[in-house]
Amino acid sequence: MAKPNGIIYSSPKSPQHPKIYAKTQVIEHSTQSNGYLSMLRLKLSNKGFWRAYRAPSGYIATRGSSLRCHSAETRHAETEECVREYRDSSDTSSMQGKDKDPASLGKSGTPSPGLAEACKFVYNDAKFVNERAKNDIVLLSRGIMRLDARARQDVAFLGSEFLKLDARAREHTEKIDNDVKRKAERLHHVATILKNKAQSRLKNAADRHWSDGALEADLRRADFAAKQRAMEDALMALEFVKNIHDMMVSKMCNLKRSSLNPNKMTERITLEKNGKMLNFLPGEVSAERISAIQEAYWDIAAALSEADGIDYTDPEELELLVATLIDLDAMDGKSSVSLLAECSSSPDVNTRKALANALSAAPSMWTLGNAGMGALQRLAEDTTLNRCCCIENHQRIEEAVGNRGGGQLEVHGERKITRR
């Protein structure tokens, strides 16, 4: 605000610094001399102070002029504005000043004691306010520095806490990872132990099974089944040979009957050889030739049986083989005779026992043939062989045959021929 013929210093209170209070001092001084009216009003705050306008001759306030200085601030920026207005009513006023005498000029230019004292008081107050403002600024800067240090400490504390949390999270992660690895290793170790125990138990069970003989019996049973299948195949071949033999024997019987009938002398014997039909007269085919053919077939059957890998030293296989030969009525064959001769004179007691048991299982003594009965006689005369029911049965049968006179045994080399 401005008043005519006066100087006004004003500083409004800033809303941004509530702690800083405004101190206002108003000094008014009025004098009435030489038509001058001086009024000084000073308004100061803790932000600063305004010094009065000093002219070379002292503090002067001219009539018709006004000096207005004030400080204005907004919410975001503070500006200081000083407006000085000099108004002259006319150019004559300055001319009047020139027309005055030097005495009056000297008198008017000398400052009054009251104004000097007022200025001194104003200067002291302004100095005091300035010192107070400096102290407030120092305190404010210290507070700001404390706040900055506190903020830095808080930031450092937060950073350290974040680092601690990160380190703790890493420790927890490593601990969980180590626990998982440890559990996996433990499970693997337990699985390995269980596997080793299972393998050891299985091995012990297999060893116990082998020591008990069950595994060996299983292997022998499987081998026996395989050999039995092979012998069944050989049996089929032998049956085929036996059928051929029976047909040839029946053919010879028919030839003998036809030889007695003169009306059938013209009949011929038809044989097939290598796909060709051969016609022979009844007299052209002799019994020796038929016997040779029969022996050839028996040799074929023996070769088939030997090709199957039959072991004559095995008692079980020997019993099976002898039973098969008895069923086929092939005990008098060449291979059968050699087999019975070798087994009856074998140094192995089990082999001789097996042969005796197989011969005793024959349904009739006539099915044994000469080779079978000769082998049975040799086994009966064996002193080292324990007497069994089969040999006793053979002796009873032999006694019964001898008492009736129904049979006589003649030995021609290795072959025995039965005559009725």
Curated annotation (Swiss-Prot):
InterPro entries: AAF-like (IPR044973)
GO terms, biological process: cellular response to oxidative stress; leaf senescence
Keywords: Chloroplast, Plastid, Transit peptide
Record: transit peptide: 1-68
Subcellular location: Plastid, Chloroplast
Region (Disordered): 85-111
Record keyword Chloroplast present: yes
Highest taxon in the source lineage: Eukaryota
GO cellular component: chloroplast
Induction note: Induced by abscisic acid (ABA), salicylate (SA), methyl jasmonate (MeJA) and ethylene.
Reported tissue expression: Expressed in leaves.
Main location group: plastid
Family: Belongs to the ATA15/OSA15 family.
Cited function: May be involved in the regulation of leaf senescence.
Name under which the protein is recorded: Senescence-associated protein SPA15, chloroplastic
